[in-house]
């Protein structure tokens, strides 16, 4: 007799991708395109895609719209996580989060160390949940985005029900 837990059933999510950059337009957005390819190849749907400047108000405006939309289950952002003067994505996003997933950033840096050694200390990648929507805040490097998707995000999205699903399952049923 086995007490093995059955594998979770895959659920396709609707994911939005936000590129944050002062220098990239649609043609130069390698990281955003890579994330779109990864999520669609994994069986998820692209809900929306946008590019905004490194401006906390522009970032918050788009993100606020997406976390309030019923057609977005998760958001992937790329760019603005470094330590230069214009890198302000974590500061722009943190006030919107209901819960921060601190282990995500920690694990991201551990995995990044294999490729970029101590330069990973300059990354401020993070994740959280806002209005029952997963938010993943990634560097602008396409390699970092691919690694985060392959080793962290795709696994989390596959094995964890979306916060929106968990929220619905806790709601009392109407009689």
Regions picked out by a protein language model, each given a short descriptive name:
Residues 12-13, 70-72, 130-133:
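Short coil/turn connectors at secondary-structure junctions
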Residues 40-42, 47-97:
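N-terminal small/polar loop signature for handling phosphorylated ligands or for N-terminal nucleophile
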């Amino acid at each position: 007799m086995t007490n093995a837990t059955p594998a979770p059933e895959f659920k396709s999510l609707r994911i939005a991708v936000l590129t944050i950059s002062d220098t990239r337009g649609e043609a130069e957005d390698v990281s955003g395109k890579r994330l779109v390819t990864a999520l669609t190849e994994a069986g998820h749907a692209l809900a929306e895609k946008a590019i905004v400047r490194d401006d906390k108000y522009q970032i918050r405006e788009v993100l606020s719209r997406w976390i309030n939309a019923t057609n977005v289950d998760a958001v992937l952002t790329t760019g603005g996580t470094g330590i230069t003067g214009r890198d302000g994505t974590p500061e722009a996003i943190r006030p919107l989060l209901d819960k921060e997933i601190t282990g995500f950033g920690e694990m991201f840096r551990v995995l990044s160390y294999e490729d970029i050694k101590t330069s990973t200390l300059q990354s401020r990648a993070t994740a959280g949940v806002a209005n029952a929507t997963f938010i993943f805040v990634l560097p602008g490097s396409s390699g970092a985005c691919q690694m985060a998707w392959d080793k962290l995000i795709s696994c989390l999205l596959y094995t964890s029900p979306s916060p929106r699903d968990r929220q619905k399952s806790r709601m009392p049923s109407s009689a």
